Amino acid sequence: DGLIEMDGMKKRTITLADSHRADRIPVVGVVTAGVPILAVENIEGYLPWDGEAGCFALRVRGDSMIGAGILDGDRVVVRSQPTADNGEIVVALLGDSATVKRFRKDGNQIWLLPENPAYQPIDGNHAQIIGKVKAVIRTY
């Protein structure tokens, strides 16, 4: 499936392929990649998304996940789910604050790990997993 279509019978007829095919997902605010900040869920707009249902997007603020390729200003697409497996990148709620980190469980201890040595791991035992990061969207 291509992104453009051409009519071989006509000259200069290039059109977008079925642009209605992709679903849209809401951009619902900001999540930090650094020190958690207050989580306020406001729909700021929509992004096209041709992936699975149950996803939303968040803007990233901070640099704690640069080692995972998630930069300040990126948007992360998140699948809503309350659990995570070791090594997955998640969005977690800590009280009223949301953060994006790598999930790790060691026995009964849950850690939310940054991907930048300038930041410390966060004790995640009282965190609520909001979802798993499925994609990173960067605009230049």
Give the positions of each predicted feature.
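C-terminal regulatory/effector modules of DNA-binding transcriptional regulators
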Residues: 68-140
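Short, positionally conserved secondary-structure boundary motifs
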Residues: 1-71, 97-98, 105-109, 120-122, ...
